[in-house]
Curated annotation (Swiss-Prot):
GO terms for cellular component: basolateral plasma membrane; growth cone; membrane; membrane raft; plasma membrane; plasma membrane raft. N-glycosylated. N-glycosylation inhibits channel activity in T cells. Ubiquitinated. Belongs to the Orai family. Oligomerizes in homomeric and heteromeric ORAI complexes. Native CRAC channels most likely consist of hexameric ORAI heteromers, implying that diverse ORAI1, ORAI2 and ORAI3 subunit combinations with distinct biophysical properties can operate in a cell-type specific way. ARC channels are heteropentamers consisting of three ORAI1 and two ORAI3 subunits. Interacts with STIM1 and STIM2; this regulates channel activity. Interacts with CALM; this may displace STIM1 and STIM2 and might thereby modulate channel activity. Interacts (via N-terminus) with AKAP5 upon store depletion. The modification Phosphothreonine is found at residue 298. It comes from the Eukaryota. GO terms for molecular function: calcium channel activity; calmodulin binding; identical protein binding; store-operated calcium channel activity. This is Calcium release-activated calcium channel protein 1.
């Protein structure tokens, strides 16, 4: 009888290790130690290429220019929002004041029995006409430019600010702002004073009221007959009181307007000087970097 063949070797048998078991377990341990899943025998990654000094200068300059471009876009957006706010304020103020002037001119009732001074009616009519014309001009500018600025400001895109006409129409926007706030307001104050004179001047002293400039011993009939010859009537007193109140208010308004304009110009001038100093500092740093590059290239040319 032939002997039975030996069973095949089993990998799980600890008494019969495989010839390649040690290398397999070693490779597994090396993978666990390495942590990145790559065998230790793999070649290392090549180092990043060295950046030359001119390339570094170019990269730094491009980064600074990109930051400068973003700051310019932010400045353009601020100007756009400022122009939009000015146009909105001008349109509201002009519509309100011009409407009030028109209503005041229409609703005023002139006394046909009273002899008005010829210059009073002329000045009142001219002031009302100029007031309405100035405010309507400012309202027309606001109505024409504001929709274009609103259409651009509602688009959520940084580059859309270039499509807005606020830079090109800057003079028109400032003109509308000046007409509505400065000239229009001064004309409105003058309109109020003239309206008081036109409205209250026909009022005369009643028959039983004595004249304040004459003794009260005179008869009432004589006072009534001589009321037009001397003294101040109640209408004149009311008009003078309104004028005395409005003149200091007008002076205060003018002083405030001049002070506000000077403060605003001073603020803008300081901002311009600050931006110029920043540009000068940037130019100085750029010049230093350029000279440093020249110094770094000089020894190589010397040894060559």
């Amino acid at each position: 009888m032939h002997p039975e063949p030996a069973p095949p070797p089993n990998n799980s048998n600890p008494e019969l290790p495989l010839s390649g078991g040690s290398s397999t377990s070693g490779s597994r341990r090396s993978r666990r130690r390495s942590g990145d899943g790559e065998p230790t025998g793999a070649p290392p990654l090549p180092p990043p290429p060295a950046v030359s000094y001119p390339d570094w200068i170019g990269q730094s300059y491009s980064e600074v220019m990109s930051l400068n471009e973003h700051s310019m876009q932010a400045l353009s957006w601020r100007k756009l929002y400022l122009s939009r706010a000015k146009l909105k304020a001008s349109s509201r103020t002009s519509a309100l004041l011009s409407g009030f002037a028109m209503v005041a001119m229409v609703e005023v009732q002139l006394d046909t029995d009273h002899d008005y001074p010829p210059g009073l009616l002329i000045v009142f009519s001219a002031c009302t006409t100029v007031l309405v014309a100035v405010h309507l001009f400012a309202l027309m500018i606001s109505t024409c430019i504001l929709p274009n600025i609103e259409a651009v400001s509602n688009v959520h895109n940084l580059n859309s600010v270039k499509e807005s006409p606020h830079e090109r129409m800057h003079r028109h926007i400032e003109l509308a702002w000046a007409f509505s706030t400065v000239i229009g307001t001064l004309l409105f104050l003058a309109e109020v004073v003239l309206l008081c004179w036109v409205k209250f001047l026909p009022l005369k002293r009643q028959a039983g009221q004595p004249s304040p400039t004459k003794p009260p011993t005179e008869p009432a009939v004589v006072v009534a007959n001589s009321s037009n010859n001397g003294g101040i009537t109640p209408g004149e007193a009311a008009a003078i009181a309104s004028t005395a109140i409005m003149v200091p208010c007008g002076l205060v308004f003018i002083v405030f307007a001049v002070h506000f304009y000077r403060s605003l110009v001073s603020h803008k001038t300081d901002r311009q000087f600050q931006e110029l100093n920043e540009l000068a500092e940037f130019a100085r740093l750029q010049d230093q970097l350029d000279h440093r590059g020249d110094h770094s290239l000089t020894p190589g040319t010397h040894y060559a």
